[in-house]
């Protein structure tokens, strides 16, 4: 059965909330079941009982994999299953809740449509699921953030037929992934800042040294041991000479975190999830973002989470590996085998390339998602990226020079 884009589904019921080139819409669907490979992001598809097509609810582009849809040729073999009618109004929220940046930057803004709908449908319920069938609970930051926002939710399932399901288009993608987000998104981010006071530091460094404490359950997708700064100890030592305190955002509650960033005077950090918390910082905050090789080439849109502050960049890093396909880079299988065409992540570079292969059902390569591992020869692979998540090291002298310029 063919898969239709959300923006072209049920067009007579679309509600336009922002008349911009991106266009922020709410699509109203009736008598809907959730289907697909599974009902978790990014595989969930929607099927109205009255139509002969499926709907892809994800109005976005996965930048690292250059995909708009995770189904080949926009087709899926839909098999109807018995479903139980569920009355009432629901708002679809099965988005990326595993990767911290994507949750904060891409997922949360869609709540704008939810808040607008509540004005007309006060009993509307948020319909959500984890990002993978093997994950039974959310990371603490997800539940805590929804609590701060005053949003309760129900877990989606594939045996219910939802009487009325509203689906919002993206405020950060929508065909313009590499352009500034909708202004409507900022109203949601402003709601995220808690009311607690904080005695935390005003000048701090967002550490990626997760091995210091070993507590990663509040981190979401954990790349700190893959896109690892090999000499981060030296980075921390240098910054301490300037009164810049090392913090671990994963050890803070969401309310503590948003409060800390809302009062920050100076923030230094390696580009990644921790730095997107600058969304909660005022324009007066000075920030220094340490870029890593090729990261911004793929994820240039990340800058929109930081550039409202007094932002400087430090391009002081280089890869530490020298193999053709770097450790933790993404590759595509091109050799003749049953795996041809699949995308994976390099886990080892000795005696061939050890690769964790995706079954085309994930948007990233979270280490706690189960995947099969295979060994390939170099000629059986081609690069998907040039090592945006590979280990690197900082040039401390250059970093210190860039810091001094910011402090002048």
Describe these PLM feature segments.
Residues 334-343:
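Short coil-to-beta-strand transition motifs
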Residues 1-330, 342, 350-351, 357-408:
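The feature primarily captures lumenal catalytic ectodomains
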